[in-house]
Amino acid sequence: EITTRLVGSEMCIRDSYPCMGCRSFPTSEDSQRDPDGTRKYYGRFNQGVVTINLVDVACSAEGHIDRFWEILESRLELCHRALRCRHERLLGTVSDVAPILWQHGALARLKKGETIDKLLFNGYSTISLGYAGLCEMCVRMTGKTHTSPEGKKLALEVMQKLNDKCKEWKEAENISYSVYGTPMESTTYKFAKCL
């Protein structure tokens, strides 16, 4: 009962951290620590999300698993380019555009006129590769949902691929890419309009 009532900084005591919105949590970065040495979660942020439509990948592959992996690889590179566009759009932003966020401590304590660039690297912020349609992708590719042994195997392989790509990009660019279960409330409509 007491645990369910804890909020904010009290939650840190029990290694439970509130999310940044619906489903995005800051990653645990060794480079981000408070002055007392504990991991820093509060004041960090997410640069944005780009979502891969796994159902479209499966439908485009027409049930052929080799083709599925080729298309997935291609779409992941497209997502990576889009994520880089989001990141690069933020580069050069000066703290003056949102003083409460960047100067007065909501996210940082930068000087007037200072850019937020250093906050976009080295784990201070994350940028997310979202995914949508994992269950439906499994049904299209295996005829079974992600809760069946066949579907679960494919779902885990795909999730591992997404994680591996984020790790690869992070190591190459020093930008903290993360995997994010995209809320489908508005994304479904956007995907439907594109098909």
Region locations from a protein language model:
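Single conserved hydrophobic/aromatic residue that forms the stacking wall/gate
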Residues: 1-8, 13
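Function-dense linear segments that define catalytic or interfacial modules
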Residues: 14-116
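Secondary-structure capping and boundary motifs in well-ordered enzyme cores
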Residues: 44, 102-107, 118-130, 151-158
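Inter-helical turn/loop segments and adjacent helix faces that build the functional surface
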Residues: 58-72, 140-152, 169
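Short glycine/threonine-rich loop-to-helix capping motif typified by GTGT followed
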Residues: 105-108, 145-147, 186-195
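Contiguous, well-ordered alpha-helical segments that form the cores/surfaces of helical PPI scaffolds
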Residues: 127-140, 160
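Catalytic phosphate/nucleotide-handling subdomain of diverse soluble enzymes
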Residues: 151-169, 174
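Extended amphipathic alpha-helical segments with heptad-repeat/coiled-coil character used for oligomerization
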Residues: 170-195
